[in-house]
Amino acid sequence: MINNELFKILNVEKIPYAVIEGKHDIDSYKVENELFNPDIDIVLLTNSKQIISVLKSKQAFDYLGDCSFRENTTNTRIDLYFNSLNVGYYHYLKVHANSFVNQKLSEEEYIIYQILDPILKFSKYYPRHQCRLEKYFASVIPKEVKVKLESALGKSLSDALLIKISNKDFSISKIFIKRCKLRLLFINGNFVKMLKSRIF
């Protein structure tokens, strides 16, 4: 899954990074109904979007728009995040400095990513997401997951979501997702980000 060319460029540009991957990823791809080509998702510790221009100039990558590329040799999609985990203007978790030192999200950060990213991006949990969450929730979830999820969604929504996942209930209503998105608008300057995206 590691793309050597991408990481060579990041090292040359001196951009710290944290790969978004978990210990149950490989097993989870087996439950999809069709052949699944895993993406490379990576958080960069930089406010500069200069890396977008750098990758655009490389023949090894095709630009897909926004912060996404396709690596030509392996036909792998690459999605870049900057400093935090987000879906559009919904920034829900600032990545800890230690994750950039380790070049990988912490398990707590990754679990939160698995909880929120699918419902914000797809409005559902695909089989691969369900598989991963079931495996993580088979053990006691770290307290930090609940704390950080509450800071993003508030106690009521966070508790409701954790209970559903603990019970292997992955049916999330559109109304519940709208409530989550509304709550997220009022953290991390997301409301301003939304206004800017709509005005400009």
Where are the regions a protein language model picked out?
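Conserved NTP-donor binding/palm subdomain of two-metal-ion nucleotidyltransferases/polymerases, i.e.
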Residues: 1-200
